[in-house]
Amino acid sequence: MGMRPDKMLPRVFLLKPGSILRDQGGNILDARSSVTLIKTERGWIIVDTGQVGDEEEILKALADLGLEKSDIDIIVNTHSHPDHCANNRLFSRAKTIYPKDGELIAPGVRALATPGHSPDSISVLVDAAIHPPRGDGTAPATRIVVIAGDALPTLGNFQKKVPPAVHYDRALAVASMNKIIAIADVVIPGHDRPFSLRE
């Protein structure tokens, strides 16, 4: 996904980390997705819009960046479960798109099919600028950030090498998780804080 040097690299902003609350038996009591913003040449892209009740936190995070909901140009949902797309309605000016595997969403931003949790699951792969890059040359100026949705919902899934508990096809879920791990420098999971796979 190399880019010409005269082109702007996308920048990634976490508006809200995801979370998941389970009872002692492991049953899900509450699930709230990560909400991620990408600045691109094509405009502002929001990936997943969260659950009902997250509106205030999302709008405040946008305001902290000097943005309003009307500034969002494109919505991409990693899948169609309500904890990931319930707030699409907040961004009425934005166009919701449904990219296919490998489709270029914007320069430096591409869809990656990651089925298993749901048939329509995708992840968003971003060739992201690191601001500021380290001046000593020890870190790349870009990192591959994968906004994984529920294909890789938590750090625990990565550490234990287990797919999401909720899935329609376990083999596909494992393959999708492994695909993300092989590509990503940084993962923004569906229901946890971002974590780094490579320094």
Which role does the model predict for each range below?
Residues M1-R42, G108, K179-I183:
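Zn-dependent metallo-beta-lactamase
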Residues D6, C85-S92, E103-P107, R198:
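Short loop/helix-cap segments at secondary-structure boundaries that form the rim of catalytic
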Residues L14-P17, V35-K39, I45, D101-P133:
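Core dinuclear metal-dependent hydrolase active-site scaffold
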Residues L21-N27, Q51-D54, I74-I75, A111-P115, ...:
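Short, flexible loop segments at the rims of nucleotide/cofactor-binding pockets, characterized by
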Residues I45-V47, I147:
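Conserved catalytic cores of phosphodiester-cleaving nucleases, focusing on short active-site segments
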Residues G53, A113, P119-E199:
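Metallo-beta-lactamase
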Residues E55-I97:
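Active-site metal-binding motif and surrounding structural segment of the metallo-beta-lactamase
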Residues D71-I72, A94-K100, I147-G149, V166:
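Short hydrophobic/aromatic-enriched beta-strand-loop microsegments
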